[in-house]
């Protein structure tokens, strides 16, 4: 990919739409001041980019101002200011004509616009009612967009998607699995990953913009480190994860304290999941193992079987009797679970 240098731009009252007011104490003045400060700090930001797009920080400002809105920390809202990142998100998911895409937290609709322009039909889930109204108005003339006002981590997304895909297949029998593309609210990233990855019968790819530190913990944890956790076993059980690229924090408003990153999860179809006798029991074993992370498995799994029996199972699985959970790969846990399940 080509590297480009994005330079800061000057924003002044004359460049804004008539709806903007710049009185000393107006909300718009405060919003403009914070955006200008954020942009002045990003003198040079290197990103891989394609063509330019007008749906950038200007439209983000105007959209927020039109609603008198300010990003809410409680909702993890950080709006994208660089339209090229939206293009790259869509590219990472290989979005094309006829795709069905789920977007979580559409915000002002800048990423949504890219997806629709590529020919995708978009279902957006948005918790903030003001943003629901904004994107509903923005895409009112499109038959490729629907937004639901719901808290994603509490909504029945599987039911929504199964109903939608069933209807689509009546008119498009050969339609592919859906995709997820989202600039995710940072405060729900782990919950979203846990919800989406087991849906390989619905989604083929999940492409998310996450905090960089979280992305590295989820995708590239090292064995025998404190970063290696049960969620890493879950991720590799249900998907093939890939860290795509880092997104500097200067590309967001408000500017977060950390950089972000784009991550792709290529979901496995259920028929390709690791062969375990019971998925529920498998993850119960994994979670139990990590509850005593620094303990040997023969101690942390005592509620499942006696220490001598756990040691025996470890031996049959080809693992040392002194094994600890952070030392086991997904395949190791699968072998251990299946040995214990047979006994």
UniProtKB/Swiss-Prot annotation:
Domain of life: Eukaryota
An annotated GO BP: response to cold
Enzyme Commission designation: 2.1.1.-
Keywords, sorted A to Z: Chloroplast, Methyltransferase, Plastid, RNA-binding, rRNA processing, S-adenosyl-L-methionine, Transferase, Transit peptide
Locations listed in the record: Plastid, Chloroplast
GO cellular component: chloroplast
Record bears the keyword Ribonucleoprotein: no
GO molecular function terms noted in the UniProt entry: mRNA (2'-O-methyladenosine-N6-)-methyltransferase activity; RNA binding; rRNA (adenine-N6,N6-)-dimethyltransferase activity
Observed phenotype of the null mutant: No visible phenotype when grown at 22 degrees Celsius. Chilling-induced chlorosis and reduced growth at 5 degrees Celsius.
Transit peptide feature range: 1-48
Residues that hold S-adenosyl-L-methionine according to the record: 78, 80, 105, 126, 151, 183
Chief localization: plastid
SMART domains, per the entry: rADc
PANTHER family associated with the record: DIMETHYLADENOSINE TRANSFERASE, RIBOSOMAL RNA SMALL SUBUNIT METHYLTRANSFERASE, CHLOROPLASTIC
Family from the record: Belongs to the class I-like SAM-binding methyltransferase superfamily. rRNA adenine N(6)-methyltransferase family.
Annotated protein name in UniProt: Ribosomal RNA small subunit methyltransferase, chloroplastic
